[in-house]
Amino acid sequence: MFIFNWFKSFFTDFFSTTPGEGVVPISNDYLPLTVVEYVYMGDGTVEAVTMTYEEAQEYYKNPWRWSTPTTSSNTQNTQSSSDSYDTNVPVHVWAGDSCGSSCDSSCSSTSCD
């Protein structure tokens, strides 16, 4: 029981913070944040789309972001490249159609022989 209470008090003290204490807050005033998303275009190239923090917040609120390529105002900042990138960055794949290459009964594709 002692160990349980010790862990409970440790985690409560460690993870509970009040405004102005604990974790150092980072704001856009001190650190301009940008989000770089690498999008596989289907033809063997990867495009890097750079967005500001605010643009990324709006973009990731869009529930249809997986179904269409980005239409961000920063598309002029995209660069086609086949170089290797940081593997910690998620790569989002846009397939173009809902069937993809799988041939199941829900697809009405005629390419499934």
Curated annotation (Swiss-Prot):
Protein name from the UniProt record: Uncharacterized 12.6 kDa protein in mrh-soc intergenic region
Domain of life according to the entry: Viruses
Chain intervals with Low complexity compositional bias: 67-85
Pfam families per record: DUF7206
InterPro entries to which the protein is assigned, alphabetical: DUF7206
Spans annotated as Disordered: 66-85
Originating species: Enterobacteria phage T4 (Bacteriophage T4)
Upper lineage: Viruses, Duplodnaviria, Heunggongvirae, Uroviricota, Caudoviricetes
